[in-house]
Amino acid sequence: KLSEGPFISYQRTVDVEMKESDCEVTETFSYKISAPFWHYLLHFPMKRALKNSNHSKKLNVWWAPPNRFDAQTSQTVSLLCVAAIVTGFLGALIGQTATFAAEEFGAGDRAQGILLATVRIGVLLTVFITALADNRGRKKLLEFSLYGGCFLAVLSAVAPNLWILGLTQSFARGFATSISILIGIMAAEAAPKGSRAYIAGLLTLSAGLGAGIPVWILFLADIHLKGWRLLFATAIIFFPAIRWIHLNLGESKRFIAHIENHQFNTARKQKIIIKRVLFLASVAFLLFLFVSPASQFRNEFLRDERDFSAAKISLFLLTAYTPQIIGVAIASKVSDLKGRKPVAMIAVGIGTILTVASYSIDGF
């Protein structure tokens, strides 16, 4: 029977059949993985790990987290990964379509730059939503942000001009950023201490999967001058998924404990390390000062400087960025074992050099 592990149900049966000179032992596993939506992906790796479990003292295979998850943690992380797909999709939409929208509206690079800068104002909405999370609950605001972001994405599909598109996407981007932050909070509160970077890696990969959806269907922009609108309309497919998250995702236990302690005045005041917060905020500011224009103007660069069509951009991005999955998987595992700081320094340093090189070299 199951004592601990990421299973809804688990049973191991050993049958021994005696023969003349020896015996035959048959080991059977019957289990159901507590990983909504992702259990199909985990079936064969888990099957192989259990099959080889007798050959090693530990079942902690290379793809598994450093700490063993229980069923509740596994379910929570799985559902948060689905939410991460949504935020990845919402966050990538304007960057992939801005150049095509500008073409329809007869706008130049300057107007496109203003559009992309205006979208960043949505961070004010993010601050407001996340500030409420400590009083209203993480789950409630996560669902609100998911619905709000997808609704505004669909609304962007019928934007009559570039400025209305910028307005709707400003709020949509604010919701998308709120989703990312709330997912991170809920994941950190649900995760064992030694597996937080691992879970952050899973969420990053899931968000990358969501960001890849606009890339996969970018060829629609080649169909017609207004074809880019179909990418925004695609957000409608996420509404059933959000409803499913609502039915299966529980509120953070840490938030529930916080509310109970607050009611009975038993909560201890925790000290915020201001210097560390300011340092991390400064690092994030400088990083996005470089990353944002490099990513937001990438498609414009590929169209104007490399003469790429929408379909060719899709092929290029899928070919160039898919191998990043390996890097994220390795970095998240190493971060839990060796520390976050050295991994971040190496990744940011090498990534910056390669990004600059990609825009500086003429290609082949």
Regions found by a protein language model. Give the residues of each.
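Glycine-rich segments within core transmembrane alpha-helices of 12-TM secondary carriers
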Residues: 195-222, 238
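Central cavity-lining transmembrane alpha-helices of secondary-active solute carriers
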Residues: 116-131, 184, 318-331
